[in-house]
Amino acid sequence: MFKYIGDIVKGTGTQLRSLVMVFGHGFRKRDTLQYPEEQVYLPPRYRGRIVLTRDPDGEERCVACNLCAVACPVGCISLQKAETEDGRWYPDFFRINFSRCIFCGLCEEACPTTAIQLTPDFEMAEFKRQDLVYEKEDLLISGPGKNPDYNFYRVAGMAVAGKPKGAAQNEAEPINVKSLLP
């Protein structure tokens, strides 16, 4: 008989404790965000979707050096080099498979021209896996991205057709390294 009374008291105590816990949580701030209306906080260095940028002249920054594809630990980047009449390299095709990408940022670090940049965009959900394979046209943005004044060909010293090195618009004169010696 006393065993049954003890079980009843124990069960009632458990129910009361659960009710107190439920009502206590009802007055606290919620942990869940209503996502589309309330945007998620992203840290300043968040690595999201990859984009290809343009230089200040509006040309593609990518020179198809293939360093990004080599640096990628999962091998989700593929590209093919082509060359213009003036000798400038560009990617004939540039493809990233975002279903395999782990957003590590190694491709951005490996890029000598800052053509590849990671943006804070993370909304890339698709119903088909094939739709997560982005081509160059999908990745190329109209602006220069994080480095608006950088132009690889101005720094690299490639001569512009018809002008000597250092004579093109916004280009610095070449430095004579022998004059810097003591």
Swiss-Prot record:
Localization annotation: Cell inner membrane
Positions annotated to bind [4Fe-4S] cluster 2: C72, C101, C104, C107
Gene3D superfamilies: 3.30.70.3270
Cofactor note: Binds 2 [4Fe-4S] clusters per subunit.
Example of a GO biological process term: aerobic respiration
Binding site for [4Fe-4S] cluster 1: C62, C65, C68, C111
Cofactor: [4Fe-4S] cluster
UniProt keyword terms in alphabetical order: 4Fe-4S, Cell inner membrane, Cell membrane, Iron, Iron-sulfur, Membrane, Metal-binding, NAD, Quinone, Repeat, Translocase, Ubiquinone
EC numbers, comma separated: 7.1.1.-
Catalyzed chemical reaction(s): a quinone + NADH + 5 H(+)(in) = a quinol + NAD(+) + 4 H(+)(out)
Membrane topology: Peripheral membrane protein
GO CC terms of this entry: plasma membrane
GO MF annotations in UniProt: 4 iron, 4 sulfur cluster binding; iron ion binding; NADH:ubiquinone reductase (non-electrogenic) activity; quinone binding
Annotated ranges, domain 4Fe-4S ferredoxin-type: 52-82, 92-121
Name of the top EC class for this enzyme: translocase
Any single Pfam family the record assigns to this protein: Fer4_7
Keyword Translocase: yes
Functional note: NDH-1 shuttles electrons from NADH, via FMN and iron-sulfur (Fe-S) centers, to quinones in the respiratory chain. The immediate electron acceptor for the enzyme in this species is believed to be ubiquinone. Couples the redox reaction to proton translocation (for every two electrons transferred, four hydrogen ions are translocated across the cytoplasmic membrane), and thus conserves the redox energy in a proton gradient.
PANTHER family the record matches: NADH DEHYDROGENASE [UBIQUINONE] IRON-SULFUR PROTEIN 8, MITOCHONDRIAL, NADH DEHYDROGENASE UBIQUINONE IRON-SULFUR PROTEIN 8, MITOCHONDRIAL
The protein's assembly and partners: NDH-1 is composed of 13 different subunits. Subunits NuoA, H, J, K, L, M, N constitute the membrane sector of the complex.
NCBIfam families: NuoI, PRK05888.1-1
Family the UniProt entry places it in: Belongs to the complex I 23 kDa subunit family.
Protein name (Swiss-Prot/TrEMBL): NADH-quinone oxidoreductase subunit I
Native species: Pseudomonas fluorescens (strain Pf0-1)
Gene designation per UniProt: nuoI
